[in-house]
């Protein structure tokens, strides 16, 4: 985290992710280790939260950002102030998405690759610029999609610009380029 603390962000059974300060854990202050909760937004139920997420420093804005996939879709928070996570963008009401899975930004934070993990579902690629420019708060239409085989499902992915490394249960490792996200 940009505050210098080493943090562990964990999924839990609830409408949020827990943030633990590992310095407190190492020093034996277990009661103080839970330092924040990142909510899933207004659309979440009390029972479910995030499935998967990515957190990292965004140098263009000086923010620590959290990208979470879970109940209802996907959420992006500014978590620079851990006590007051600021919801920046939601990706809800997306056709075919009731629960987000893996959700990963490009290094500049403009695009995200989103997964849902069910058969026939492609990876969806979204452009976040309309939200970050203040035009909208929610994005619900992908600009493109990718799949190795429409009859199978992709499982997880990782971005190492400009490539997306994708694992599939039946298709193994696949790699595609995000150099032109709309193609």
What are these regions (language model features)?
Residues 1-183:
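Feature marking well-ordered beta-strand scaffolds used for ligand recognition
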């Amino acid at each position: 985290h940009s505050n210098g603390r080493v943090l562990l962000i964990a999924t839990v059974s609830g409408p949020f992710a827990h943030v633990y300060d590992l310095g407190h854990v190492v020093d034996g202050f277990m009661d103080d280790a839970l330092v924040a909760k990142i909510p899933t937004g207004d659309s979440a139920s009390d029972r479910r939260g995030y499935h998967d997420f990515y957190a990292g420093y965004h140098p263009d804005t000086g923010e620590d950002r959290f990208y979470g996939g879970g109940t209802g879709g996907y959420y992006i928070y500014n978590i620079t102030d851990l006590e007051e996570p600021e919801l920046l963008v939601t990706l809800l009401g997306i056709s075919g998405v009731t629960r987000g899975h893996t959700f990963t930004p490009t290094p500049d934070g403009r695009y995200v690759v989103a997964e849902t993990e069910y058969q026939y579902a492609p990876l969806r690629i979204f452009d976040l610029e309309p939200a970050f420019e203040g035009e909208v708060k929610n994005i619900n239409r992908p600009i493109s999609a990718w799949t190795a085989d429409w009859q199978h499902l992709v499982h997880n992915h990782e971005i190492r610009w400009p490539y997306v490394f994708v694992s599939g249960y039946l298709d193994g490792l696949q790699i595609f380029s995000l150099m032109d996200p709309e193609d």
